[in-house]
Amino acid sequence: MEPFTTFSLVASSLILLICWALVKANKPAKNLPPGPPKLPIIGNMHQLESQSPHRVLRKLSRKYGPIMHLQLGQVPTVVISTPRLVEEVVKHHDINFADRPTNTTSQIFYYNNQNVAWSSYGNYWRQIKKIVTLELLSVKKVRSFSSIRAEELTRAVKSVEPSVGSTINFRDLTSQTVNNMVSRATLGDVCKERHILLDTMNDILKTFNSFNVVNFFPSLQFLNVITGKKAKWLKIHKQLDHILENILEEHKSKPKGNQDDEDLIDVLLRVKDAGGQELPITNDNVKAITLEMLTAGTSSSSMTIEWAFCELMRHPEVMKKVQSDVRSAVKGNKVTEDDIQNMHYLKLVVKETLRLHGVPILVPRQNREDCNVLGYHIPAKTKILINAWACGTDPDTWEDPESFIPERFEKSSVSYFGTDFQLIPFGTGRRICPGVNFGIGTVEAVLSNFLYHFDWKLPDGVKPQDIDMTEVTGISTLPKYPLHIVPVSTVSQQK
């Protein structure tokens, strides 16, 4: 594109934004929720220039209130920051707030938002949510993958054994283990292009975690074109689509087996071929859901495992207690899924990790119609951000809220299934993540095996308080620096 043409487009867009800002400034506002002062054009965008926006939003909410209005570029936004306000939204406005705002990258990569997380609320979303919940990620189906988890964990344990006494990159270990478990459950054992697909997925996750001005100024869609971003995304999507199409063809050509042995693509293709759905299932639907299983199932689980180990290495007394819990529950020389059900303290550790280090801000919602929440006017098409981390660290709900204390759940019935609004790492209401059982099963299996088979210490000269807990926030949060720790002995060496 010629420089003059580019300059003209940018200049024209600036003029349009100024006109939009002037019109908006002169338009009388109804009783919106309180919020910080807004700058011309960008509104409150400058206040979210942080690696931890959930912390910034909590700080602002403590000043302006648990329901807070922000203007993020052209996008009116309401932030919900306490369990009581989340309950108000879910119990009285869940259907109205069940839609999703426009997201350019999700539209491209998920086949025009044909996945569960980003699909608009309606008949299609209800249909695929039901399929995913009842067919793909039911308790029975998740249990059917136990042999895959066991095989991959045996492989992971063997890979660590030669490194006993040496420092290892724990993030690499967990990412590889979880990727193998999730990809085998989704794609099956025989998938020629699995590793290429996983590499392409990393490109997608980087795209989702990167800043895109168009998400804040939807009228400037052309910027994605002139900057080359859209062409880059379409190229990645084309590569991805080719790989997924080949994988579907592999599955279609293999002999039909027992339903208990089906991977997730087998299940989707079986449902597609059976018909009887209100809206016929297409190949693009199958590919969008497959991609979602891979991206959502790998990144969030591996991050939770790394955060759990960061906390355990910072709290040796908790590490000692959870290892005792795990080892006393194991009846043989390997961890079984029946054993895990008896690891009560491990489950408290997982719950406390999710409270402090789960998804910090839930996938944005959007209301279809004007409504009132606690007397405040919420105009239609407002982006709704639920700060799950702020709910999990609400001082009116939790004692010593930012300390890692698994024992706080010992006599508590609070669960992470979305009905207790002070702990919502998987969301709540109609839009709750359907993969809770799958994700928790993965996290508990990996943690229990690494805690059972090895003792762990920090590298020489590193103290527990030296572990850097600085966050980097994208879809989830992860430690800014990968955890490096030393496996010092194995169970067999201790016996």
UniProtKB/Swiss-Prot annotation:
- Xref: Pfam families: p450
Write down the species. Inula hupehensis
**Protein name from the UniProt record:** Germacrene A acid 8-beta-hydroxylase
This protein's GO cellular component annotations are:
membrane
Q: What is the lineage of its organism?
A: Eukaryota, Viridiplantae, Streptophyta, Embryophyta, Tracheophyta
User: Which PROSITE patterns does UniProt cross-reference here?
Assistant: CYTOCHROME_P450
Enzyme Commission numbers on file: 1.14.14.168, 1.14.14.170
**Per its Swiss-Prot or TrEMBL entry, what cofactor is needed?**
heme
Q: Pathway involvement?
A: Secondary metabolite biosynthesis; terpenoid biosynthesis
